[in-house]
């Protein structure tokens, strides 16, 4: 007796996770062959789910381990040189400059003790300023050889060269007080002369001694040699030692020339030269202090150029909005410009806008220093698509 069994023509397996996904085994599959009787082919469809649903599957690992990242290119810090290390790398010309600074101090004392004229006090102060400037320049050149001075690190983003700004700012304040003190001396002498007009003939001319001529000649000689041997630096900085060497050299040569011709250094000429040096030191110190204060406050010195640069950027019709614009100067040789824009164009238009903005910055605020050595500009343009 033959029993009829209902053989299913297809087996449909319902996915317990998604009811819409099923796997069907049809009776239209190829028949198993004699060589491989147990072969069973499964129809693979795009909706077929591969893998498994165990708890250790990658799809269930919500907290994956972090990817291997390269170490930071910027180090945390550089070793700070000690005084012994700084003195060990001094070259022979630098040691010679330090020795000449001591000579400046000795000549300043000799000029001050050689007479009572006001110009002698002024020249002695000017010689002291030259000696201090020589020490600062040697210190600056020596520290420039270390990595921590100009290289960027996390502890010092712009290097330790920003100490240079603090030292120069302190020196400019010293120049201001020195100029005010030198202005006070001729004013006091003028008031005394006006109060004692009937004794003016007794103090019209000051006695000239041989050591006065020697002191003035020595100050002229060392200032002249310092002016000739002082090469201009390749870096931009506010304090120019050549200017101060010339400020001492010119009055010394004038006084030596007058003394050699037989003229005595009268009070009028003494006060005139003293006032000239004092006013020059005061004006120069104030201008240096103002520009360095703006650098220390992380701003830019020329506001008109900054406004011109921002207005030129806003005039570009391709720019939808200027989000921010920050232009500042952290050091003599470094200027930073950060610009944020919103542009609706594609990648090519964004690249063209970025190049035009860099060109505008270099033509406006980047050219205020004139010819010669220019500061290094770090320009970043952040463009967002509208």
UniProtKB/Swiss-Prot annotation:
GO terms for biological process: intracellular zinc ion homeostasis; zinc ion import into Golgi lumen; zinc ion import into organelle. Disruption phenotype: Leads to sensitivity to camptothecin and DNA-damaging agents. It comes from the Eukaryota. It is a multi-pass membrane protein. GO terms for molecular function: zinc ion transmembrane transporter activity. The chain crosses the membrane at residues 102-122, 128-148, 163-183, 208-228, 243-263, 268-288. It is found in: Cytoplasm; Nucleus membrane. InterPro entries: Cation_efflux (IPR002524). Keywords: Cytoplasm, Ion transport, Membrane, Nucleus, Transmembrane, Transmembrane helix, Transport, Zinc, Zinc transport. GO terms for cellular component: cytosol; Golgi membrane; nuclear membrane. Belongs to the cation diffusion facilitator (CDF) transporter (TC 2.A.4) family. SLC30A subfamily. Interacts with cis4. Probable transporter involved in the regulation of zinc homeostasis. This is Probable zinc transporter zrg17. The lineage of its organism: Eukaryota, Fungi, Dikarya, Ascomycota, Taphrinomycotina. The gene is zrg17.
